[in-house]
């Protein structure tokens, strides 16, 4: 009976009538989380967290375990789908002013940070060349922290270099953080239902709402079927599209890859890190590239919530999207001119968006007041 009541309550959940397709990505992320946990469990059953056996265990999963290739590809490509959905979800939040639901936005940003940490630890687990060197470069950034940096790095590595204890720790952290994500995700959804959804107009939704079921349910199911179709098409026909060729070789500490880079979904942050020729400055910029999202609810000065009616901010928003793409592209290139200059200009524009947000809001208010 309690389950039936829950279903009835969920079906009767009041939702704004005018929410568009951009509001579907939240439920897509819930589906992605479920798939990642499920496929991750089956991979963990066969995986061995040992530097001599990790790479071989991944080969064993893909070759010998029934449907192991599918589990491995679903988990790896599923992570890329996860980040595509989450970046669209964040962009929608910025565009339509969803960040004004402070608790929901802050819990969501914390969730993003935890998700990025989990994905990073997971990328190290296959113990390929790029896994090893990406781990070396990124964890080395901790040494930039004054006084505590070296101690923290040694503690994280479990020694004075990346070795077997590091892989064991990363495996344990990747496993435990997924449960942290589920907990924080539940909190995020609860806070969302407390504050209520925003809508494309940025107005109060209370005056015009409909039950979640059937309209929104079918809308979500349609989107989910399209996402699953895209995922299965990629897994079946282009399983290695997001993989780095270097990662098909076992980790070798004596051979450095020509160009060290993380997965594509971290390239924007990595590009910002590389654009600053100072270790501490780069590490701070890397942290700020994500942390700056936390400032959005506190720097909103416009009397209008959504960018639907803010043409100047729309221009700034699409500049941010283009900048994100440019930083991602430049991070795949060698550290040499003109790519370093492009990265530096793009990184400056990236941070400028969230600095310009309050200034443009204030300017818009003045224009509307005098018109």
From Swiss-Prot:
The keyword Lipid metabolism does not apply. Heme 1 (or BL or b562) is low-potential and absorbs at about 562 nm, and heme 2 (or BH or b566) is high-potential and absorbs at about 566 nm. It is a multi-pass membrane protein. The keyword Iron applies. The cytochrome bc1 complex contains 3 respiratory subunits (MT-CYB, CYC1 and UQCRFS1), 2 core proteins (UQCRC1 and UQCRC2) and probably 6 low-molecular weight proteins. Heme b b566 binds at residues 89, 188. A ubiquinone binds at residue 193. GO terms for biological process: mitochondrial electron transport, ubiquinol to cytochrome c. This is Cytochrome b. GO terms for cellular component: mitochondrial inner membrane; respiratory chain complex III. It comes from Eryx elegans (Central Asian sand boa). CDD domains: cytochrome_b_C, Cytochrome_b_N. Component of the ubiquinol-cytochrome c reductase complex (complex III or cytochrome b-c1 complex) that is part of the mitochondrial respiratory chain. The b-c1 complex mediates electron transfer from ubiquinol to cytochrome c. Contributes to the generation of a proton gradient across the mitochondrial membrane that is then used for ATP synthesis.
